[in-house]
């Protein structure tokens, strides 16, 4: 009997080709677009993004073309609770969230997988660029064939339970080949551009988005230097992130950067580039893929943002499942709330959320 797989289809080229590849490999494929858009004008404005109504139309058209059933499933409440509310709360606390990592952790590989299992379906699949393999008794994640498109940074939270039930067929290919396959089989989405912004924010202006939702909570405050001297007025801490230089709305005669955010005092601390450089961080909420827990110091390559090349570091376990990360070289703008992710060559070791 054919194994069944529920493919999350965003209307983009990657998930479309993932569905096609799995069908070619002999799976019984069912396409699903997750309805995560909220009942407000933000999502109407956002038409064309991976959460929009036009994305549903694209996904349905692809499903018809490759001959698989297609459904829209409602994940609105779970998405609002685990992604949107988390996103807003983090900015309010002076941290910089990563909504894609939260979505992978709580929606795509949790709520979506739960739905598949309740329906008696064997696997879920996505268009992620990553490779899942089984080594001995353990599932591992390796970087994809396409280094530029590799998405392992956002997958460090996956558990053995989830990996055993997840397929990522695009990981074996370069993006150019995925587009080529889409064109060969006549998919109109073959040249659809990649969505790079936050799916639920129409213009990528997260400050405006939060201000519109919670006008009473976003208040003006002071820009200060490291000594606490007032330098000017900011429009609300949710508009800023560590390392930011542009959009401060104030001129200093020299480049100034956001080096800290103090939510309790409603202050944004500005400093020089040198103030952004650091070699150490502490991360919490850690998860490891090739093993359950880190028991002793380990040499890895680590990165503190999605688009960065990993740098050499030593990770050391400390109390409460947290980890200390010591980089060999200074890192620019280590940002609370973002994830630090560890590798050994092309093997994903794990990661955690930067605490300090």
Swiss-Prot record:
GO terms, biological process: tRNA wobble position uridine thiolation
Q: A Pfam family for this UniProt protein?
A: tRNA_Me_trans_M
Q: Where in the cell is it found?
A: Cytoplasm
Active site, per annotation:
103, 199
* Reactions this protein catalyses: S-sulfanyl-L-cysteinyl-[protein] + uridine(34) in tRNA + AH2 + ATP = 2-thiouridine(34) in tRNA + L-cysteinyl-[protein] + A + AMP + diphosphate + H(+)
The EC number(s) given in the record are 2.8.1.13
In this chain, ATP is annotated as bound at 8-15, 34, 127
Disulfide bonds listed in the record: 103-199
Q: Give GO terms: molecular function aspect only.
A: ATP binding; tRNA binding; tRNA-uridine 2-sulfurtransferase activity
Location of site Interaction with tRNA?
Answer: 128, 338
One GO cellular component term, please give it. cytoplasm
Q: Which InterPro entries match?
A: MnmA-like, MnmA-like_C, MnmA-like_central, MnmA-like_central_sf, Rossmann-like_a/b/a_fold
Q: Which key words tag this protein in UniProt?
A: ATP-binding, Cytoplasm, Disulfide bond, Nucleotide-binding, RNA-binding, Transferase, tRNA processing, tRNA-binding
According to its UniProt record, this protein's enzyme class is transferase
Residue ranges for the region (Interaction with tRNA) are 149-151, 305-306
PANTHER family tied to this protein: MITOCHONDRIAL TRNA-SPECIFIC 2-THIOURIDYLASE 1, TRNA 5-METHYLAMINOMETHYL-2-THIOURIDYLATE -METHYLTRANSFERASE
Family according to the record: Belongs to the MnmA/TRMU family.
Q: What does this protein do?
A: Catalyzes the 2-thiolation of uridine at the wobble position (U34) of tRNA, leading to the formation of s(2)U34.
This chain belongs to the protein called tRNA-specific 2-thiouridylase MnmA 1
Q: Which organism is it from?
A: Clostridium botulinum (strain Langeland / NCTC 10281 / Type F)
